[in-house]
Each structure stands twice: as structure tokens, then as C-alpha cells.
Amino acid sequence: MQQQQHPAPGAEFVADRDAARAEVERALGGYSFRDGGALLLEDALTHSVHPRDEAGGRARHQRLEFLGDAALGLAFATIFYRDDPGLDQGDLTVLRSANVSTQKLARVAVRRRLYPLLRRYNCAPQDHEVSRFTKSVEGPYSGDPIEGPRVLADIVEAIVGAVYLDSKLDLEVLQKVAKLLCEPIITKKALLEDPESMLNELGGEHREDLEIKILAWRKVANVVDDGREQAITTSGLGNGSEDEVGKLRTIRIEEA
């Protein structure tokens, strides 16, 4: 007798679409889609290679991804601009990018259990990749981050795109949903108080940029690199070239 194959952890499929909608609305902090919005949400939760593609499903899903990507950037740009007047343009750019990065959004999808809600077809290798990443996110930090599958970030972006359309492009609703969905938010305060946890949210993506910002916010730090102490200021590492910024991933940082 052939042994039944069980879905990999984190890759189970939720066939009940009403249950899938309820799960998404919970992840969105109780946001409720309008009657027509249910169709938008189903497009967001249908993989671009699903057989429904012949009805234009692929194009609709990808258009929602595109819109959601831009909408998330707008949401976080306005949130940081409004909530922290002390942030300059560089700070705003780095914080926005960190909160909408592929790695950050992939972790959001895992924590909100969004992948099992995705309608997909013949995606066993992808399921395995998602399962492996899910275990790395939910387990203890190993020090060797696994890159988040792009499909996870795509789901988050498509859902946000659906919300933005369903809300009639309401920026206030968009900001609220983005903050609730993407917790924990990477902020200046959080980076200064718990930099390790916040940087782990990103894997390797944008990590160097944020390390530089942390040091700039602290004004001056001592950096030990091969026994040579150098000052770090808002202009970068010592008097060296911008290429030296890459060293920040492998040096030990000690606050002055």
C-alpha cells in the first residue's frame, strides 16, 4: 500500500475559502472585505501558475502584487514621516526599505500563516522551500539565516494590494493594516533598544544599511577591526571609501 504523503509543515493547504478569508482578516487586525472585495482577496490568494490562469488569474494576481508593493512603501513612508519628525531623508529611506524588504515580508507571511491559504498547483519544490524557511523562522536563531522564498513576500504584497483597492484607496486604512500585519515594525527606537532582534528580521538584506544607521544614531562608536580602532560617524567608516562599509557585517561593534 502506498504511504500517504503529508504536506510539509508550513505548506498545508486550506481548501475552505471562507476559512481562508477569515484567517486573512484576522491577520489584518479585523479588517473586513466588502462583498466585492472577496473576489479581490481570492485573486491575491491564487498563485500565478494556478490552472485558473486561463481566466486571467495570473495577470490579476501580479497586478495586485505590483499595487501592494507600492502601497506598502507609501504606508511606511507616511507612517515614519508622521510619527518621527527627527528622521532625515536617509533615515526614512532605510527604515521604509527595511520594513518592505523581501526578507521582512517573508517572515510576516510565516508568522501570519499565509502560505497555506494560497491556491497553488504542482508546487512541491516550492512547498519544501517554504517549509524549510518556516522552520528557520519559528525555531531558535541558528546564526545562519535562510533566504525567504519570494512567493511569501508576493502573498503579503498581493493581500495589501487587495485591501488598498477594497478600501477605495484609503490611506488611513492602509497605514493601519500595514502596521498590524507587519509587526514587529523596524523603527529607530527598536533598533537602538534591541538591534540584534531587529536585524535578524532581515536576514542579510539591508542589514549593512541599518548597521550604519544604528552607529550614526549613536553618533560615535568604537569599532575593532584587526586591532585597529576607527571612528564611525554619519559619513561612514573612518576616512575610507564607501567599499569599506561592507566590513560592518564581520566586525565587532562596541559602543563608545
From Swiss-Prot:
Entries under SUPFAM superfamilies matching the protein: RNase III domain-like
Keyword line: Endonuclease, Hydrolase, Magnesium, Manganese, Metal-binding, Nuclease, RNA-binding
Cross-referenced PROSITE patterns: RNASE_3_1, RNASE_3_2
Cofactor needs: Mg(2+); Mn(2+)
Domain RNase III intervals: 22-168
GO cellular component: cytoplasm; nucleus
Top-level EC class: hydrolase
Annotated protein name in UniProt: Ribonuclease 3-like protein 1
Organism listed in the record: Oryza sativa subsp. japonica (Rice)
Biological classification of the source: Eukaryota, Viridiplantae, Streptophyta, Embryophyta, Tracheophyta
